[in-house]
């Protein structure tokens, strides 16, 4: 929007409407935007939801995913104020690059359609955010009573229901 050019950034302004079914991490504001619409779990009524599904969906695929974007191949380049600054130590950068390269190679091997491979480098940020989201969501879910009780619902274990929610 050209009328904003040269003016101070309004850090309270969202780029999407509250009812939007999406979430995002904005590195230049160092913020995660989670509109109300994103908390509707597709295919479920609220009374049908259990912690496993909610943590798999909301914790992993949404909140954890967006948090992890702050530390992926792009988000890590911004400091806590949203400035484009190198703030990691050389050792941290080297360790990150080593692990990221493994993920790039792993995704390069995926062939979802015969003859077509995923570009692991191009999808790195999303792949890191997906993995980080899953791991953060699991850590949060492990603190719930449902996880501790470990009782099946509809013949599915709590962890199976967690991944059903993620899917």
What are these regions (language model features)?
Residues 1-61, 66, 70-167:
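Intrinsically disordered, low-complexity linker/terminal regions across diverse proteins
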